[in-house]
Amino acid sequence: FGLNLSRLDIRQEAARHYKLITSVCKKLGIADYSKLSEEAKIKFLSKEYKSRRPLIPQNIKLDADDRETWTTFKMISESPRECLGAYVISMASNVSDILVVMLLQKEAGIKSCLRIVPLFETLSDLQNSHIVMESLFKHSWYVNYFKKNQEIMIGYSDSSKDAGKFAASWAQYCAQEKLGNIATKYKIKLTLFHGRGGSVGRGGGPVYAALLSQPPGTVNARTRVTEQGEVIQQKYGSESLAEYSLGTYIGAVLEATLSPPIQPKKKWRNLMDEMSILSSESYRGYLNNNKNFLRYFDEITPKNILDKLYIGSRPSKRKKSQDIKDLRAIPWVFAWTQIRLVLPAWLGTTEALQLASRGKNKLILKDMLYRWPFFYEMMDMLDMILTKTNQRVIEYYEECLADNDLKKIGRNLRKNLSLLIDLNKKLIPSHILNQRKEFRKSILIRDTYAEILNLLQANIMLRLSKKNIDRKQKEILMEAMIVTISGISAAMKNTG
């Protein structure tokens, strides 16, 4: 009938487009696209986009992955334009990642191209995002096609998994700031799209504080934010809740636009740079320099059981491998939250705050805390996460499921967590801690019930690990496991 409600965004990983165009070039005998330099790729893609001659034959034979990618573009060309929004490129890192989507849209016969939204996710991609976008904005044919409008998505989940929450938060802030400056330079109307999850480790947290802590001049009366399935009910489950949530967004966007936060001082930036480097090195050291760390994650958390349950809309891994890099951020965060370690939200921060607690840094930190909304919100989220951790529960999981090697890793992690809790109490003024304590009361109440579910979950995992259980027992235990997962998630609130 020609009616449509909300528009659907299309999302695909940059590697899939790269693989498709490489296959096409190989089959047509044009060039080995994979061996071209970035400059040569840009030149080739621009030339083919402007050419009236089609590049991809209608009857081209492709493998299953390439056929799926190409079929998506063909489907877009056959769908009403009013039903579709943006084309999001996940794991974007180069100008060619963006231009190849322009070319594929043209080749598929899409008359009015979907706006292209690069999603910068890893730490290095965030740090280089302004260089990529400035290079793109120099191509007038691209800029003019979209009438000087550009949407850019900031990845919170994978950058945190890649470098740790502290370093990722600072990289996200700097990336937005630089992207805003580049957009102003080229007179581009920029919309930042925040790919936040429900958990702090994936960029979650109170909306108002998050928007008011963005770099000055980057909101400009518009924003886009992802809302996770787990929070839709609590934010939009009734008319009054929906009105309140939308009102919060509108109020925060207006305030951030009309009364933006102050520019961070140079000494604040310098300290954040030092803390960020130290935090990232520490986080990656824990993950990469201990051969048993991945085994600890596999055996102590319910990660392997989560893989078998129908939770979430995407597979838990991008590829079939044992590498943490290939694990999606959602199960990574979810599994650590279940055992109450909530590791992705704080690991690496201890070392950063130890640096900030020395000498003159302590005064700079205090200044940042009182005068910089970004840093205040960052520390507020850290305090909330520390309240949700439970070291007795973590130790119980280890008693049930860990061998001596894994218990050693657990002791080191809990020691690091204890140091961070003490640092947080020493560095944050007592009146702020007392104020936060009032807001955390509901967490402590829910914790009483969550502890029981955690003890049950650890015992269920132990019984499921036995080889001599029959099929009926396994079914009963899996049902009980789902109940504990749901209950702990409800108690923790922001989990995925």
Where do the protein language model's features map onto the residues?
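Catalytic cores of alpha/beta
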Residues: 128-134, 202-210
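Structured alpha-helical segments in the cores of large, soluble enzyme domains
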Residues: 62-80, 94-110, 132-152, 172-186, ...
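Acidic, His- and aromatic-enriched active-site or binding-groove loops in soluble protein domains
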Residues: 24-38, 110-115, 140-146, 211-229
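Hydrophobic faces of well-ordered beta-strands that scaffold small-molecule active sites
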Residues: 8, 85-89, 112-120, 150-154, ...
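Conserved, mostly hydrophobic/aromatic
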Residues: 2, 118, 198
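Conserved radical SAM core fold
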Residues: 119-126, 155-162
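Acidic, glycine-enriched catalytic cores built around paired aspartates
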Residues: 9-11, 16-18, 30-58, 65-73, ...
